[in-house]
Amino acid sequence: MNESDALPDFNRIWAARVAASPSPRMHDDGIERAFWRDFISRKVYKPESSARQVLAYLRPLLREHQIETALEFGPGWGSYTLDLAALCREVACVDLSQDVLDFVLRAGRERVFCNLRAFHSKWEDFSPERTYDLVFGYNCFYRQGDLADCLARMTRTANKLCVAGMNVAVLPPWLQEMKDVGASANWDWKDPVYFV
């Protein structure tokens, strides 16, 4: 790539995709909270297999950087949270859903983790009282209208390391079959290239 090659404005592209989403969850905090309340009420703590793979890669990195404190935003059902609690002296979670926070804290207590804290807030509105060795967000960026600000917040809040990740699902075989017959399908509307 030449210096004169213009890079796309990832933040503008990302914001346009978030704004164009037909899902009311993207734009209405009450609907998002209701979704998580319903989802968490049926959930049992069990980390996803993909989280195991990510953590196998991250554990040595976290040890190498001597991570003792972590802040995770958007913990979902805690696929990463309790592993972070096992590795760190303290883990703080930030989420707009109190139901999510209660679920993660309960799962932690059931596994005798006493080093978890929770902050009921949207990441965009959260004002941390201190910094953390690690700021961690995984699969939680879907509502971030200003991704550049989100990443800048992570950087300001981290002393040593930021981890921002997003799983990219494997395309189902029927999607290619649809394309082969001329059908239109929008599977990957947030291109991870703009996220990296």
Segments predicted by a language model, with ranges:
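A short glycine-rich, Lys/Arg-flanked "PGG" loop and its adjoining helix->strand segment in the class I
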Residues: 148-162
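Class I SAM-dependent methyltransferase SAM/SAH-binding core
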Residues: 79, 84-114, 119-124
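Class I SAM-dependent methyltransferase "Motif I" SAM/SAH-binding loop
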Residues: 74-78
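Short alpha-helix
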Residues: 188-196
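A short SAM/SAH-binding and catalytic strip from SAM-dependent methyltransferases
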Residues: 134-146
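Conserved class I S-adenosyl-L-methionine
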Residues: 1-65, 163-187
